[in-house]
Amino acid sequence: MSCSTYLSQPKQQLDMSYIVPLLKSPLEQYYLFQGGLKRTDLNDTKADTSTLAVSRYWENSSGWQKALNLRWRLDHYTQGTVTDTTMLLYPGVSVNRTRSRGGMMPTWGDSQRYSVDVSDTTWGSDIDFVILQAQNVWIRTLAERHRFVFRGNVGWIETNDFDRVPPDLRFFAGGDRSIRGYKYKDVSPRDSDDKLTGASKMATGSVEYQYNF
């Protein structure tokens, strides 16, 4: 069992997790139980969030990790000029893989993550949605010192009531791992009062060149 806290001016968070390994292959197959509380005050987002989740993980020799998830969350939030409370119960699937060579400053590597999450009022959620996400980072080095970092993220939310999608599930861009030169999560559509609303669709990409002295 583990417990972690994160404290900063825009976010305070408490997370707990418990892993139950399976006897057949305890390092590669296990259940993960999680719970958390979070308070956010960032840009035009204010939110209090409670979460619970149970996940079943599989890993294989190729490095791909697969998971089936069932998540519950309760959000009371203000996004821009809209204040609401949303309760969600939603299953999902995800696959991801991370590879690297070169220690703390990898000279070669990649990270890939793909996920689908589904919510429906049929089983008690406040809204229906389907959320698709793909996140990729590639690192390659030429002639020992010339390091290139490629990033690409795509997200899509299909829903019958976007205003009730919690801010954590909406898409915001900006920051050094998204669009450099913009504040963290400061790029999204804005409402008539020039407040950030978050987006239902997102596509970002970047290429960085780094020279290692």
Residue ranges and their predicted role:
Residues 13-17, 59, 90-213:
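Extended beta-strand-rich architecture
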Residues 1-113, 177-181, 185-195, 200:
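Gram-negative/organellar outer-membrane beta-barrel architecture
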